[in-house]
Every structure is written in structure tokens, then in C-alpha cells.
Amino acid sequence: MKEFWNERYAEEAYAYGQEANDFIKAQQIGTGLKVLCLAEGEGRNAVYIASLGNDVTCIDYSQEGLQKTARLAQMNGVQVTGICEDLSQTQLQQEHWDLIVGVFAHFPAHVKEHIWPQVFAALKPGGQLLMEVYDQEQLRFGTGGPQHLDLLYGKEELEALLTKQFNSIQIEKIYRDVHEGVYHNGAAATLQVRALK
């Protein structure tokens, strides 16, 4: 899988565009926050959040993606710290982040089991998790995202993962047009998540 992402991000164009995800842009993200972006790819969300005046780190296991993140950050006059790590093995620092972001961060079951408890532990008290992911219904649209059901999310699955850990969660299933580069393009079924520790 790592080779797949390195090949995709080795293309000259930004696979998912250079603009941040619409859900992320619609949030009231403050300034001066320590922010972690998971499976951030080419850095479009990290760069946007850094442009608001935040200290942003992103983790991805594609070196090609992180190189494009650095290039995009330079083009936008901001700094983003990139860490090349496999999220199935990473150990996140506890109570370190004000905000953790996961945009279309889709993982196999064993990675989900590893990473989501760590995300909760890594947030400071009062910290926030923001996510937009493809719903399982996305398979019928064929406009982006994984083509395997087990890599997609169901609302009930996310509720089960997050309810026992977060003090407040809001999960909304929506149908919207996603236009993010050439690989996420068209009508889609997504889940948008806001969770507070």
C-alpha cells in the first residue's frame, strides 16, 4: 500500500488538489494551536491550518506525499512539520495536541483499533477531533475513496469507536459534491465528525 501512495504522489499534479477540504474550511479553527493531521498525503489541510497561525505536524507514510507537503507549505509561506511513519505502528505523545484532523483517513480494521484510542489519548483535555471520511454507501457512487467496504466507515462504527472515549461527539452523514483533485470528484456520501475530549 505504501508503494501505491508513493506512486500516486510522485505525479507532478497534486492528486487531491491544493485547497483544503470544504469541511475543514467551514470549521472555526482558532490560532496558536498544536495541530496533528493524520494520513495527510500532500498536505493541503495541514498547510491551510498552518496559514491560520497554528503549529501543524502531519503524519503520513508516503515520503513523496511529505515532500509535496513541504513544497506546498513553502509556496504558501508557512511551516508544517512532516513525519514519515506508519500509523499502524506509531505511538502518539499523550495529551499533546489541541486539535487532530483526519480527512479521508481510511484504514484497515487493525489500524483503526490501534490509532483511534491513541488519538483520544494524544488530545489535551478539551481538545478536538475533526474528521471527514467516506461512508460505506460511497461504494455505489464510485467517485473516490477506497473500493473495499472494510476501509470505509459506518456511522454506527464511528459512534462505537468514539462514544466511549470522547465527552461530546457529533457525527453527521451527508451527501455532497466533493471536488478535490482528480481522485475525489463528484457526488459522495461522507461522515463529518466533531468530537471533544
Residue ranges of model-derived segments:
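Conserved class I S-adenosyl-L-methionine
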Residues: M1-G30, E137
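Conserved SAM/SAH-binding beta-strand->alpha-helix loop
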Residues: S62-E64
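Conserved SAM-binding strand-loop segment of SAM-dependent methyltransferases
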Residues: N76-S88
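A short acidic, Gly/Pro-enriched loop at the edge of an enzyme's catalytic core
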Residues: S88-L99
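A short SAM/SAH-binding and catalytic strip from SAM-dependent methyltransferases
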Residues: D98-E113
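A short glycine-rich, Lys/Arg-flanked "PGG" loop and its adjoining helix->strand segment in the class I
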Residues: E113-P125
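Conserved beta-strand signature within the Rossmann-like core of class I S-adenosyl-L-methionine
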Residues: G126-Y134
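Acceptor-substrate binding/catalytic loop of class I
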Residues: Q138-L158, V182-H184, T190
